């Protein structure tokens, strides 16, 4: 995967309005999981959420998202499709209240990757294959060593990507 002008060249681009300027160097990648409604994948609800276009009346679980403005740099769908919402040189709003190695507000120094799924369900082969390519490219381009789960930087609030996320598949050749 090739990065040019803060974007993956081959990723689908849907530019979210939910970002801020980046003031710190990138040295962390945070992996998340998301599906709206939880466990339902055949829709564009996540894309709509990141674009502030989610129809909150579609599902009762969406009501708590009414005033939420969030985004991620990348979103990896079940079939492996990669969508980029925020350029890497900007802060996506993915981590919320967070801390890593004593530093707060991980959005400022991390890249956020949402993986379509839920914490108690296995991820797909296509997701692992493309996620490995993404991580390999980002680690080289930005010289990043640390890749963590959202649950690691926000342990009181978050559980994603969950216990069924197979980290060993990211190390396979």
What spans do the regions from the language model cover?
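Short loop/turn segments at strand-loop or loop-helix junctions that form parts
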Residues: 34, 114-116
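Basic/polar, cationic surfaces and motifs that engage anionic cell-wall
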Residues: 1-8, 23, 104-111, 118-173
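N-terminal catalytic cores of peptidoglycan-degrading enzymes
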Residues: 1-104
